[in-house]
Amino acid sequence: MFSQRLLTQTSLFSLASLAASQSAIQFDGRVPAGTQLSAFDSENGLFNPSNVFGKNLTFSQLLQLPDVPPSLFDAGTVPLEVTISDQSIFAPSATNVQLGFRRAELLPASNNGTDPSTSGVKSLHFSLMKDTARPLNLSHEYQLAFVESNDFSTNQFVLKTGTLLDTATQGGVDPDSLILFGNVKQSQILFNTAFTEGVFHNFGLTLDFNANTTQVFYSTGNDPLAQVTEPLTNDISGQGQYHFGVLKKGVNGGADITKDAFQPSGINEGIIFGGIFQEDSSASTITLSPQAGANATAAASNGTAAGCTKKRSVGSIAGRLQYVRED
């Protein structure tokens, strides 16, 4: 089994060593305090201003800056809420109007589908919280965070809530849960937890695009992330783009759920996001909590859940664990 042992030898390492040990940030979607919603309607360096939202809408019409405490990794940055309404009908083209969906999603600005965020070994961070004033309709299935392959053929992972449409996986799963699936072509549940209100749910996903594995770290509130799975075999090939938001699927979809499924009227729903960023994990580390004098990180072990490469700590740099093979 995966194991780790922290050696408290931080005094042996210099500040220069600490600085050199920080993981590189691939993209950063944390919103600086004081940002105006109008900033999201044009190039802003955080999120793509053109996708994904309903025809004739803008992000400043559907985003909110909620009055909630910061999420785990928000320091000098603020949470951002994504909302949907009856007008949230995405139309990628004149012949592809998604009447069966209501959706609005944030895409990282630098994530064009073939950029390095979907190669090597990366750790994706995001937190999300319910808005009790804009509750979801849990008789529907929702996608809240996912990566869509560059050829649009699959989602390599997807975080869902609500009543699952896949009858093979919906049995025994409380609709009021956060359910993390691997590649939707396999419909494997990687992790699930109750979607309790009044608190941020924090996720760290270590995505090894070389080994095709996904490892899950999770916590609530201000608690540091904790490992909740081994690296699990999951096909994350195909590159693509990350989405954070609300994709509400209709019911009774027929042959094409995107166009034919039923959606009720009077929709006013939202999810609050915070702490969205991605770091490089090629050194087999993932940040578990924000820097507070020390950058607390832990191993993101290589391999699969069965027969994974074990690693052990052989030292630390101000809380940053260093690992070697333990075959």
Predicted regions and their residues:
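Surface-exposed loop/edge segments in extracytoplasmic proteins
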Residues: 153-155, 187-191, 223-230
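Localized edge beta-strand/strand-to-loop motifs within extracellular or lumenal beta-rich domains
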Residues: 196-214, 221-222
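Juxtamembrane loop segments immediately following a transmembrane helix
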Residues: 207, 217-243, 249
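Hydrophobic residues embedded in beta-strands of well-ordered beta-sheets
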Residues: 78-80, 176-178, 212-214
